């Protein structure tokens, strides 16, 4: 059972319009050797910013989330830049297709595709189809270079929610 403030926050998130985005976390799961579906029992916090999501690449690993139903909190925190972590949050019960980790520009990356249940086929399918790697690379590569060249001055603990496992 959720306490009142947690339930109020969840109710708020459900009212926020879903957004299609490529976002990031700073934790990857090194155990999969082949793609697999995973379910998120809790909220999944991701960020538009590689630097924020990884605490300036504290560990050289980036989880990439491709989805259509995350709730973008960035506009709500526009007036509070010190607290705006460019967060896109997925609701509890969201499913992802998790791919094995791979190397890219000296960083270990892991792709997660958000899934939805197709009512006709009763199979899970990606919510957003990308035509190849280009959209991911166009989002990721400049951010990796910028994070290495000019790390952000982040408050202590700002990235913590992006650095923990999904379970």
Question: Which stretches of residues belong to each language-model region?
Answer:
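Mono-ADP-ribosyltransferase
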Residues: 1-167
